[in-house]
Amino acid sequence: MAVKQFKAESKRLLDLMINSIYTNKEIFLRELISNASDAIDKCYYRSLVDTNITFNKDDFYIRISADKENKTLTITDTGIGMTKDDLENNLGTIAKSGSFAFKSENEAKEGVDIIGQFGVGFYSAFMVADDVTVISRSVDSEEAYKWESKGVEGYTIEKCEKETPGTEIVLKIKENTDDEKYDEFLDEYKLRSLIKKYSDFIKYPIKMMTKKTRPKKDNDKETEEYLEDETLNSMVPIWRKNKNELKQEDYDNFYMDKHFGFEKPLKTIHSNVEGVVSYNTLLFIPASAPYDFYTKEFEKGLELYSNGVMIMQKCGDLLPDYFSFVQGLVDSPDLSLNISRELLQHDRQLKFIAKKIKEKIKSELLSMAKNDRENYVKFFNSFGRQLKYGVYSDFGSNKEVLQDLLMFYSSTEKKLVTLDEYVSRMKEDQKYIYYAAGESNEKIEKLPQTEVVKDKGYEILYFTDDVDEFAIKMLMKYKEKEFKSVSNKDLGFEADEKESKKETEENKDLFDFMKEVLDGKVKEVRASSRLKSHPVCLSNDGELSIEMEKVLKMMPDNNNVKAEKILEINTNHEMFNSIKAAFKDDKDKLKKYASLLYNEALLIEGLPIEDPVQFANDVASLMK
């Protein structure tokens, strides 16, 4: 029997397909099962237009058979089958797709749903098999043919016997190597797990004879093994069902079954979209962040399916980083089953779907914030930081998308509020959105810098995440209202500032002396316009705040980053009389006062004192 050569550029092209397109050997089973599903689809479609062909869904299935002794794995379908010409054209030509041709011929007709669109999937069998045999009989013929190949050297076709239409693919599994354990593909557990992973939602039963145990009839204390014909796939994807047919319990069970999380999701988003690009999405907002969410080990992405067949387990291109917490999947008939990860990055249809997913997630979160505030607060406590990182990253390019989703603790409401809610409550004479940054709400509440803002009846937002101020610097303003830190040199209170300047000028020599004593640690010493009951505090001049300095100093090579600090003195506090007296009569004591007040201000800000021993000695000395 003559060996025929592949019509394509045999070895080089076949090697390219096996080694480049498919880097993961286990997907060979996904490819062959998808081809089998296509064959049954074709038979169904033919039955609609050809009265000679009957289609009873119960008679159509895919069977997997593993023979460990002979090291063969067989995939059988009861589909349309192939003629000799079909075998020649579809299997003899690498990258020729019978499914693609069939779809092209019938593209004007509705209901044609063929998974495979490139003829490379079948050849993935050679990743795990030395010898591949295809036995097929077409529904249009009484004759059957056997196609056999050992790889790049070519193939043979000959007549054979087969009682019923359909196709049987027999793989002679390779011998194990040091790097690869090929015989695992003959293991029942492995086959079961691969079918569950990749082909669970193929719409025809995938059957396999599986080993079971049961009590013996004559002795129920002993067990015996028996074989059972088991269907391994669930067949109907939940995301393709009508939402009206499903309960939240169905979604929750699916979420847990897929191991998306260990507790029920906070929000479920189920969409069926038809149009230029058709797709189904089933997305979940987790109730809490995974343990590794804020680490480099966390991998974002949605499961990606083509007609119920998994293409990729984690498709990161479907989610922007700021929505990386979303779990779930996308299924589209418009995506090729055999597209590589590299090509997906440039796929227009995928980009379109990703854009729509982003818009949908934002819309659902906004709705949740408005109509289900309790759960939105839970969500924000888990993932709000990620949204803030989204505002800060990429030079603020995503701020318009995310600003309405942000929440911060309010000094007046004593709970998390949105920026829109804050602005809606602003007083008529209020120019800025005021905020204060610190380690916790409790510590911020006690900050002396907040006194004057609170006295004017203005609401203050509390920033307790490291990223908060960085994000706000990118946001700059919200609804034309600029953000202003309560620690900023200029709070925008003109009358108070005028009085402060007058006090500073009257005590210029005193403040200049204190600044000199502090030897470059502060940019300025001045009379405070913001302090009411407290004696001293620090404010900052410029864009870098004291809290931002603390954050940056925790990063490598940022030890020299410093905010421009201003030491503010409450000239109405009784301690100021002691300072003025010391300036007049005891400059050495004033030096201790200056150092002491500066260190007190550092402690208020949560900053370390440079010389704790000297600080303690100064306190003791002044107590004499």
UniProtKB/Swiss-Prot annotation:
Principal location listed in the UniProt entry: cytoplasm
Stored Pfam families: HATPase_c_3, HSP90
C, as annotated region: 551-624
Keywords: ATP-binding, Chaperone, Cytoplasm, Nucleotide-binding, Stress response
The family this protein is said to belong to: Belongs to the heat shock protein 90 family.
Subunit: Homodimer.
Protein's name in the database: Chaperone protein HtpG
Gene it is expressed from: htpG
